[in-house]
Amino acid sequence: IAAIAVAANQVDVDTGKLALTKARSGEVKKFAQTMVTDHSGAIKAASDLVTKLKVTPQENDTSTALVKGGQDARAKLAKLDGAAFDKAYVDNEVAYHDTVVKALDDTLIPNAQNGELKSLLTSVRGVAAAHLEHARQLQKSLK
């Protein structure tokens, strides 16, 4: 579960950094900076917790698929510029955060056996849901 949490957050940090260099809209850049900041914080919180618990996150099919999906999305986004990039980036963020919230609700939180990990995932879920709503609002403004 920890490997999935770190991978999911790293994907959004990397995509956000790309958006900071390519986005045209000030609102999209602001959103991208929020993604980099918030998801970097989530990675640190997860890393601190696994250190405290003396566990090593194990890569698995889900974490590997998240990383691959993130790489594929960034490759597609990197080919776009301006308004086309902004729209594609925000569309990607809506889909990505929707998937993350569902994974947290359906798999990660219910299967977390450690109370501290479950608490961290619940906190991350709240942030991911807020990001999803923010991305949806941006999506509406870009149409």
What are these language model-derived features?
Residues 1-143:
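His/Met- and acidic-residue-enriched segments that coordinate or traffic transition-metal cofactors
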